[in-house]
Amino acid sequence: MLSTRTAAVAASASPASPWKLGGRSEGGASCDGCRTYRNTLRRRAAPAKVRALPPRRVDAVAMVSNAETETEKEQEEAAAASEELPVMPWATSVASGYTLLRDPHHNKGLAFTEEERDGHYLRGLLPPAVLSQELQIKKFMNTLRQYQTPLQRYIAMMNLQETDERLFYKLLIDNVVELLPFVYTPTVGEACQKYGSIFGRPQGLYVSLKDKGKVLEVLRNWPHRNIQVICVTDGERILGLGDLGCQGMGIPVGKLALYTALGGVDPSVCLPITIDVGTNNEFLLNDEFYIGLRQKRATGEEYDELIEEFMSAVKQFYGEKVLIQFEDFANHNAFDLLEKYSKSHLVFNDDIQGTASVVLAGLLAALKMVGGTLAEQTYLFLGAGEAGTGIAELIALEISKQTNAPIEECRKKVWLVDSKGLIVDSRKGSLQPFKKPWAHEHEPLKTLYDAVQSIKPTVLIGTSGVGRTFTKEIIEAMSSFNERPIIFSLSNPTSHSECTAEQAYTWSQGRSIFASGSPFAPVEYEGKTFVPGQSNNAYIFPGLGLGLVISGAVRVHEDMLLAASKALADQATQDNFEKGSIFPPFTSIRKISAHIAAAVAGKAYELGLATRLPPPSDLVKYAENCMYTPVYRNYR
């Protein structure tokens, strides 16, 4: 369940015991042998002895209650060592002492008080100093800034997440603008490329072809039962970097870290998953450190059967209200999966729907600067994949709702260019299904420049994944027939961006309204400083996810995406516009996410898709109260 602010305050005032349930949540199912084994341990645990001893002697209780078996265990282990037989990996049932310091959910580093150190057998296991959470954040930031490369900072942050979860999230929330590029894009792309080399402690859950027929058992191995948000990838299209196979795990791990830090979703209800069906990346297949299956990527029936088993197992094990976010699937699977499961599961594709929602928000905000409506603009895209067609469809949908015109007519305002040129009606026979709605009557054009000159768009959007394709002549052409050309260079990472912020402002003589997918530094042009907006999906998906969770939504509806876009656009202020930015600053992202969550939840209640009844009277306040707050708790 989501923590509430009230509960967080109560928790900080009322000490709690750092329970550790043997590596599995108490409700977790397992094989008959394991259940028998745990039941035997419970029978030996002698409740009367537990009540007879002081509360702080929990570890002593465990030792007393199992004293009768200690010699037996030692004999078994000695025999196993000599005979090379398997041994039972014994673990304490309460996080205390050495174990507590290595439990990321309960570890507080040097913030354990003197009383906690005595009560939980930490005396001598820590240096004498007691440092507050705030001071530990200051210390870690000082260390982080001394690293020379973004990847070093990424590794340090991931190590912190695996050792002190609350410090990790507090650090990220308090320094979100500085740390976001290291936790997610663009650094996460390099991390995925080198994931095998930097792999330490495993994060998330791996489902592979080896698990076919046993996916439900794999899900049961995860220690938490109350999962509400899953981010899953098959690693075939990681950012703009292509097929990284099993090493794509960095994406769902990073994505869910942002669900928590930016959207306030409790980390214990989040589950990152990678589905490993092989890879066609020859470099990885020949890399001795590659962590995935060493085989070509499965396709067709074999692939579909594993995905179907996975989706069925998730719904069976976690219920209908668990959000499944598809992440970085290749085009040929992404659209099919979204269409197939959107009617039976709570599913969301960030590459298609999340990108579209944040770009639509940027356009709505940009129109506040230039005037006019969505229907009065002409849109030209470079790139016709998941992102490009997803954005185009949401724009057409919003135009349709604003004008009451058929969506087929509204699509005619939007033009797309792919690797073969302008998508036109004469190409329909060779087009992929998701491109066909955008094939309009026009003469064939081979280049983006020709398309710009012919169509004369007011909005130019790049989702091609190919860097430096918005050339000087293209931006100058855009500026020649638009007083304020709107230019979105959305491809990630930075090296793949269609143009830089400096190029957009310089080549348009400071007149363009610019946004990018990757962050760019402020640009000075003729005495004015422009702060480029980052059209980052992280503006949308954390708040969207929170809204779905707090309302108990059972399906994602397109109207929820439109509501999220409008809520984000409303957060941009005149002060942002004067600096050239169409997005609000990330420093207020939790406030932004609360408003987006409220808008999404409100739409869920309006559409009859919410199950948490009755609806709260103040959805914004309710969303804020439901947000996870990563402050250290006191332990009794």
UniProtKB/Swiss-Prot annotation:
One of its GO terms (molecular function) is NAD binding. A divalent metal cation binds at E327, D328, D351. Its cofactor is Mg(2+); Mn(2+). NAD(+) binds at R237, D351, N492. Changing Q503E: No effect on kcat and Km for NADP. Increases Km for malate 2-fold. Residues 1-28 are annotated as: Disordered. Its main location: plastid. Keywords: Chloroplast, Metal-binding, NAD, NADP, Oxidoreductase, Plastid, Transit peptide. Changing A392G: No effect on kcat. Increases Km for NADP 3.5-fold. Increases Km for malate 2.5-fold. One of its GO terms (biological process) is malate metabolic process. Its EC number is 1.1.1.40. The chloroplastic ME isoform decarboxylates malate shuttled from neighboring mesophyll cells. The CO(2) released is then refixed by ribulose-bisphosphate carboxylase. This pathway eliminates the photorespiratory loss of CO(2) that occurs in most plants. Belongs to the malic enzymes family. This is NADP-dependent malic enzyme, chloroplastic.
